[in-house]
């Protein structure tokens, strides 16, 4: 056996359990691998990059931003009332927000709340998107 490998093996034998756990953690982070045991009889080291891409595709978005896209002039007052009730802004601030469309009305809302807000604004005549 190569002397370099022999030295590494001897160093590994002298590690405590805590040091061995830290070594495994560092190897996983450095080489982007997963050293967890996947079956009773064997340990398989697998790259985690593939797993991460699959997780990202499966994850469902939980926080949404509501964007006020367009405000027809004829519906401006009705939309202004809805925006004030949603945001809690004063008349002046809500008017500035409505007049500066496209503009974010609310951020980081859950799916149900964002759909409800979108429906209220669309009923008032606004064009709204959820991102």
From Swiss-Prot:
One of its GO terms (molecular function) is structural constituent of ribosome. CDD domains: Ribosomal_L7_L12. Gene3D superfamilies: 3.30.1390.10, Single helix bin. GO terms for cellular component: chloroplast; cytosolic large ribosomal subunit. One of its GO terms (biological process) is translation. Residues 106-125 have a biased composition (Basic and acidic residues). InterPro entries: Ribosomal_bL12 (IPR000206), Ribosomal_bL12_C (IPR013823), Ribosomal_bL12_C/ClpS-like (IPR014719), Ribosomal_bL12_oligo (IPR008932), Ribosomal_bL12_oligo_N_sf (IPR036235). Residues 106-131 are annotated as: Disordered. It is found in: Plastid, Chloroplast. Keywords: Chloroplast, Plastid, Ribonucleoprotein, Ribosomal protein. Forms part of the ribosomal stalk which helps the ribosome interact with GTP-bound translation factors. Is thus essential for accurate translation. PANTHER family: 39S RIBOSOMAL PROTEIN L12, LARGE RIBOSOMAL SUBUNIT PROTEIN BL12M. Homodimer. Part of the ribosomal stalk of the 50S ribosomal subunit. Forms a multimeric L10(L12)X complex, where L10 forms an elongated spine to which 2 to 4 L12 dimers bind in a sequential fashion. Binds GTP-bound translation factors. Belongs to the bacterial ribosomal protein bL12 family. This is Large ribosomal subunit protein bL12c. It comes from Gracilaria tenuistipitata var. liui.
């Amino acid at each position: 056996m190569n002397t370099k490998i022999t030295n590494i093996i001897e160093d590994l034998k002298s590690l405590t359990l805590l040091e061995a756990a830290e070594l495994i953690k560092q190897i996983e982070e450095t080489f982007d691998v997963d050293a967890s045991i996947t079956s009773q009889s064997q340990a398989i080291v697998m790259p985690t990059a593939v797993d991460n891409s699959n997780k990202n595709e499966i994850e469902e978005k939980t926080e949404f931003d509501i964007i006020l896209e367009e405000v027809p002039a004829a519906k401006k007052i009705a939309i202004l009332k809805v925006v004030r009730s949603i945001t809690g802004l004063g008349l002046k601030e809500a008017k500035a927000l409505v007049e500066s469309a496209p503009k974010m009305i609310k951020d980081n809302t859950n799916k149900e709340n964002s759909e409800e807000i979108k429906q209220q604004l669309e009923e008032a005549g606004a064009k709204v998107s959820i991102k």
